[in-house]
Amino acid sequence: MKKGITLILSLVMAVTLLAGCGASGSEDGSAESGDTAEVQLSGAVALNGSTSMEKVVGVLGEQFMADNQGVSVTYDATGSGAGIEAASNGRADIGLSSRAVKDEEAASGLVGTTVALDGIAVIVNAESAVADLTVEQIAKIFTGEITDWSEVGGAAGTISCVGREAGSGTRDGFESNTDTEDACKMDQELTSTGAVIEAVAGNPNAIGYASLSSVEGKDTVKAVTVGGVECSEATVLDGSYEIQRPFVFVTKADAELSAQAQAFFDFATSTAANDLIRAAGAVPVAK
């Protein structure tokens, strides 16, 4: 009889355990955790545009790929104008521009989202005696009204102006801040930020302009103060440094981004990216 009771109790316990297991699963017997499975991203994200944004998109892309190993972020440094066009015609998921989207571009269906701010540093050769210029002096130098360094406190020598090509976001930002649109007289018009820095570094009488993020750490050129104000993250953010511009992601209003491109966009425009943007020498704006 004891054996019979023991067997019955064992059967009851087994049924109870099975019932408990069934209650924690779905109707088809599969377990449900209650948590949505994490989506694994894959595919490519194509970025195209501003050469000045190279450091910023470089660190953002590297971090995003480290966090999402199935995704490849590519960057084609073509300049702001070409990047905006690439976003418009679908050759890029996200266009990169170092100027704001113009009214006519917005009217065509493009949307600009500011990722960061960047100071445009006015640079001279590292050996130059000139350390400070006003916005007015800078404008007069680039429009040809001031032609010799002795006119602004430097050693005598004919000033050589180095700038970017038409369509460059850096050039657009520089000219709009110095009120020199279509008036600059360049000795050299170059197609990348790096080329401008290299040209100024190689000519003791040269002056140029370049992204703050590209100039930091360079000992072959120096950034002059503008009206006594240094070009830095703090002075760009508080507005006291006058020559600055935005770093912008350009997308199409009527086109949905791929899952991986949208995830990259969301990451780059969030506070999670602030330290990376700052480390790249730009000023984050996400709050």
Language model features with spans:
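Exported/periplasmic ABC-transporter solute-binding proteins
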Residues: 4, 22-287
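C-terminal motif of bacterial Sec signal peptides marking the signal peptidase cleavage site
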Residues: 16-20
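N-terminal hydrophobic signal/anchor transmembrane helix of membrane proteins
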Residues: 14-15, 130
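Positively charged n-region of N-terminal signal peptides that target proteins for export
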Residues: 1-11
